[in-house]
Amino acid sequence: MTRVPARSGRHDEQTLLRTIATTPRAPVGVRGDLATAIDALRRPERRRGMAVIISDFLGPINWQRPLGAIAARHEVLAIEVLDPRDVELPDIGDVVLQDAETGVTREFTIDAQLRDDFAKAAAAHRADVARTIRSCGAPILTLRTDRDWIADIVRFVKSRRRGALAGRQ
């Protein structure tokens, strides 16, 4: 987890983006604990602010309570980073997969049934993640690695702006 103090200005924007881009990955075999990371956000900070949580949200949904606690005091934005292979398997036959966090390797034959089951399970998990985040009052921005994430951010900001303007009337 990386904490970046809120500041304004072009230099601070660039520092924030550089911090996000250069944040190191967890070592192989170390599983991230999103609930603990979110809970750590609320400990030292006393002033209200914004918490941006960037994750693939692929693990168990055991972070609703800390997210709700942080959202009660701060504005929260959840950014889901999604790879297409996280939601649908390619049609390639036999494959060896390695879990990037645990290092465990397994061999599979990817057939139509497995692809369909995987897609359904992934869609159900993503729906649960979105429902959980929204139940805490936070918006979710999904950025896919196979799309132009700048365009996705622009669409998200425009939709949020339209919603804010509609609320003022």
Swiss-Prot record:
Pfam families given in the database record: DUF58 (PF01882)
Top-level taxonomic group: Bacteria
Assigned protein family: To M.tuberculosis Rv1480.
Protein name: Uncharacterized protein MAV169
Species annotation: Mycobacterium avium
